[in-house]
Amino acid sequence: MEDKLEARFQELEEKLKNLTQEDRARVRDAFDYARSHHEGQLRKDGSPYITHPLEVAHLVAELGLDADSIMAALLHDTIEDTDATHEEVAKRFSETVADLVEGVTKLTKVKYTSTEEKQM
């Protein structure tokens, strides 16, 4: 499975040609960090949990968003579902990335009473 994960990450890298080499390295670091922190976690289908953040990162990259957004996609469940902290993510990546990760976590906790509210 590691080979498949690495191949899928390399496919993501192909979408990052517009980023600087430094930003591509930061995205790689975020992937490695998330993979390490999600080690042993599985999705309902039995696949490694990291496949979900990696697919989200693909979607974010396809939207043409910046490196911080792609990194936040990779890291979006680390603070909520692992022992990673906001402070640790901020120190390693940036305060912006940590804030984006926190924001995604908070969005998932919003409860809507109607479809109309959800779409706003």
Per-region residue spans from a language model:
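Active-site helical microenvironments for divalent-metal-assisted chemistry
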Residues: 1-120
